[in-house]
Curated annotation (Swiss-Prot):
Role summary: Odorant receptor.
GO-annotated molecular function: G protein-coupled receptor activity; olfactory receptor activity
Superkingdom classification of source: Eukaryota
Protein's name in the database: Olfactory receptor 52E4
Pfam family, one: 7tm_4
Keyword Disulfide bond: yes
Assigned GO CC terms: plasma membrane
TM segment ranges: 28-48, 57-77, 102-122, 142-162, 199-218, 239-259, 275-295
Record has Membrane as a keyword: yes
InterPro entries named among the record's database cross-references: GPCR_Rhodpsn, GPCR_Rhodpsn_7TM, Olfact_rcpt, OR51/52/56-like
Sugar attachment sites: 5
Length: 312
């Protein structure tokens, strides 16, 4: 295989153009993205701090929430700082290795979040359908195994993306009309057939579809259990415990769904719309998740208020 310094096979760097078609608006677009990114950083760091310092929150649900915050921090930080560098300082250049690394982390964190949402749905299923056995089922050992699955499955699925890109010649093509590196965009620059890349990408998407089916199945069982509860107050309490997770799922899958649909079937939609949707997908859910849990989860809300009151 040619070396990574062979500019005919691998370009020494890629140029990320940002959002072609909205070049003159880059500086204005950057400010809302910067604000949302800061909200994501502060919100998720706050969630992690509260869960770490408050012993009463050392429970399965909050361990999974801490994992969600770490994933959201990773997903947003792997994309937005580079985007802001492009918009503010015209730092379009990214090394070939750096581009592959960014691609790996974007797909890794995205995949981890889909698996974690399945795990969180299972957590709510056990909490509502088997409340008396909750602590017996979700032991520390079980939580460790589930966390390993969240990381391990996506490590296995995402690593081949790197080698699928490394096998392709680029013939000097290095202009990426995007704000970050992702598998489909890089493969599209190659001057060789990418059928294997496409097939593998569809296979990975099929895993995500299975995740969605598992989540939906969990909530069908949860709803059946909730409607069998004896009183309306108990049913409302059960719905409330699932509300945060449902909101998080909607925040994650809704922009992903629209991004996928416009990419697959929106050939007449301007390219900058595709890029804007792709960028919203990596920053809006990480910003909204801590807000949702901070507002809807009583234990989190009380501890945040307690911390700020004590500081005052």
């Amino acid at each position: 295989m040619p070396s990574i310094n062979d500019t005919h096979f691998y370009p020494p760097f890629f140029l990320l153009l940002g959002i072609p078609g909205l070049d003159t608006l880059h500086i204005w677009i950057s400010f809302p993205f910067c604000i949302v990114y800061l909200i994501a950083i502060v919100g998720n760091m706050t969630i992690l701090f509260v869960i770490k310092t408050e012993h009463s929150l050392h429970q399965p649900m909050f361990y999974f929430l801490a994992m969600l915050s770490m994933i959201d921090l990773g997903l947003s930080t792997s994309t937005i700082p580079k985007m802001l560098g492009i918009f503010w300082f015209n730092l379009q250049e990214i090394s070939f290795g750096g581009c592959l690394l960014q691609m790996f982390f974007i797909h890794m964190f995205t995949g981890m979040e889909t698996v974690l949402l399945v795990v969180m749905a299972y957590d709510r299923f056990v909490a509502i359908c088997n409340p008396l056995q909750y602590t017996m089922i979700l032991t520390n050992k079980t939580i460790s195994i589930l966390a390993s699955v969240v990381v391990g499955r996506n490590l296995v699925l995402v690593t081949p993306f790197v080698f699928l890109i490394l096998r392709l010649p680029f013939c000097g093509h290095n202009i990426v009309p995007h704000t970050y590196c992702e598998h489909r965009g890089l493969a599209g620059l190659a001057c060789a057939p990418i059928k294997i890349n496409i097939i593998y990408g569809l296979m990975v998407i099929s895993y995500i579809i299975v995740d969605v089916i598992l989540i939906a199945s969990s909530y069908v069982l949860i709803l059946r259990a909730v409607f069998r509860l004896p009183s309306q107050d108990v049913r409302l309490k059960a719905f409330n415990t699932c509300g945060s997770h449902v909101c998080v799922m909607l925040c994650f899958y809704t922009p992903a769904f629209f991004s996928f649909m416009t990419h697959r079937f929106g050939q007449n939609i301007p390219h900058y719309i595709h890029i804007l949707l792709a960028n919203l997908y990596v920053v809006v859910p990480p910003a909204l998740n801590p807000v949702i849990y901070g507002v809807r989860t009583k234990q989190i809300r009380e501890q945040i208020v307690k911390i700020f009151v004590q500081k005052e």
